[in-house]
């Protein structure tokens, strides 16, 4: 991005958005991001922080819309955007699409525990929703496994759900 590409107002709003975002002033941050939206096509980091700001302000549907608008731009691919797209397609019962997002999410994820736990959880939920049965594969996250199995048994109305809840809380 060259200096000629930047509008002074957009840049001021963008910087205010970043400062507000970093200070956890979420509503102010979102307002400033919305005022500097033209920067989406010019700044890679803008979209990520804008999406986070939308999600923090409970505007997840709007965040997903924004990601979909720029979905084919490689510069804007980041782990959390793919998580949102995966969740959106699972909720809409578009399981093939969900599998594609998960496959791509697997490529994007780093070796962080956080990203691996999210990926494993999404994979388990997608498999269960798609197949209408629990096909469990143990992960490295025992407590998370127990929580997920309990909720999925509840979703499937499994006879052992009460026992799973009892195990979970004890």
Regions found by a protein language model. Name each.
Residues 1-50, 56, 64-65, 77:
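N-terminal leader/linker segments that initiate helical-solenoid repeat arrays
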Residues 23, 57, 92, 128-131, ...:
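Structural motif corresponding to the intra-repeat A-B loop/turn of tetratricopeptide repeats
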Residues 5-13, 40-47, 74-84, 97, ...:
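Generic helix N-cap/helix-start motif at coil->alpha-helix transitions
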Residues 18-21, 92-93, 152-155, 170:
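Long, low-complexity, polar and repeat-rich extracellular regions
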Residues 1-2, 28-35, 60-74, 95-109, ...:
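Alpha-helical repeat scaffolds
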Residues 19, 52-53, 88, 122, ...:
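Residue-level signature for tetratricopeptide repeat
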Residues 51-56, 67-72, 120:
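Alpha-helical adaptor scaffolds
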């Amino acid at each position: 991005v060259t200096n000629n590409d930047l509008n002074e107002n957009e840049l001021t709003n963008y910087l205010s958005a970043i400062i507000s975002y970093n200070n956890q002033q979420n509503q102010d941050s979102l307002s400033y991001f919305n005022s500097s939206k033209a920067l989406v096509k010019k700044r890679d980091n803008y979209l990520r922080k804008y999406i986070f700001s939308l999600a923090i302000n409970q505007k997840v549907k709007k965040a997903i819309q924004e990601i979909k608008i720029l979905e084919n731009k490689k510069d804007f691919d980041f782990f959390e955007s793919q998580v949102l797209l995966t969740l959106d397609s699972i909720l809409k019962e578009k399981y093939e699409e969900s599998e594609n997002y998960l496959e791509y999410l697997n490529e994007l994820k780093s070796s962080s525990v956080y990203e691996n736990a999210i990926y494993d959880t999404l994979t388990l939920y997608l498999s269960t929703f798609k197949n209408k049965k629990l096909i469990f594969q143990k992960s490295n996250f025992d407590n998370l496994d127990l929580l997920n199995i309990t909720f999925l048994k509840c979703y499937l109305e499994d006879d052992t759900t009460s026992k799973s809840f009892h195990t979970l809380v004890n």
